[in-house]
Regions:
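Phosphodiester-processing cores and adjacent nucleic acid-binding clamps
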Residues: 1-252
Length: 252
């Protein structure tokens, strides 16, 4: 099971930082790279919603001699037309080499400078390199998820590449149903599945700190949220921690 780390550079999604392990203090924020060092990880798989933290992650991995596998989680739509807003879903694009990193920058710029934070598949195909990029379909918020569980109408064109389907088991009520849909898509289309775990905090006991952070980041005028009434959909698991991943894995 692959651990997919996310940092605070993906605002509202993680309480982990990319700080130098030597600068992490007791009682302070946990660092992805401190976790990696303490647990002897030879690689860090980092999946972010932005490229803002990429250089810091790259620099830190070089300093520590750890392999960095960086993925950009990006919104996709059927087209840029307003009526296709309901087709929005997520994909993950991993860079395989230096050219892949440059292409990620072009893809990110296209999504956020030309469009309002999304691409369609024609845009993606124009910028794609099979040798330098790898496409993965995330478990949550993918086209499989929105089409089956959110009344979405995503029509993805992934014929230009050989993707991998991610699936997770985090004790959420929807996990079993969604996993079956992913498995069905995998069999029907001959696409491999890989088990992963999204990691947003270090210890299971950090779940309340993570919840408080999400409440702050998701504040809405007129809505009173608290730890007793967080109003965070599908937020009922402490599995999104490194500790939970470690309990199920001896080595990486």
């Amino acid at each position: 099971m692959l651990p997919l780390f996310k940092s605070h550079f993906s605002i509202g999604k993680s309480i982990l930082t990319l700080d130098d392990p030597k600068k992490v203090t007791e009682g302070g924020s946990d660092s992805v790279f401190k976790i990696a060092k303490d647990n002897g990880l030879k690689q860090v798989i980092l999946v972010e919603d932005t490229l803002i933290g990429f250089f810091e992650a790259y620099k830190r991995s070089k300093e520590m001699g750890i392999q960095l596998i960086f993925g950009l989680r990006l919104s996709m739509r059927n087209s840029a037309l307003p009526e296709d807003e309901g087709s929005q879903h997520k994909i993950i694009i991993f860079a395989k080499d230096d050219l892949g990193c440059k292409l990620l920058n072009k893809i990110y710029s296209k999504a956020f400078c030309t469009n309002t934070g999304f691409l369609d598949y024609n845009d993606l195909k124009d910028l794609w390199s099979e040798d330098s990029l790898k496409l993965a379909i995330p478990f949550y918020d993918s086209f499989i998820y929105i089409n089956n569980l959110s009344f979405g109408n995503a029509v993805p064109d992934i014929s230009f590449t050989k993707p991998t389907l991610f699936f997770e088991e985090n004790d959420l009520a929807l996990d079993f149903i969604l996993k079956e849909k992913v498995k069905e898509f995998s069999i029907n289309n001959g696409i491999p599945m890989t088990k992963v775990r999204s990691i947003y905090y270090n210890k299971k006991s950090d779940v309340k700190a993570f919840m408080a952070y999400k409440i702050i980041c998701n504040r809405t005028f007129g809505r009173d949220r608290s730890l007793d009434k967080p109003e965070l959909p599908h937020f009922c698991s402490d599995k999104f921690s490194f500790e939970a991943w470690k309990e199920e894995n001896v080595t990486i």
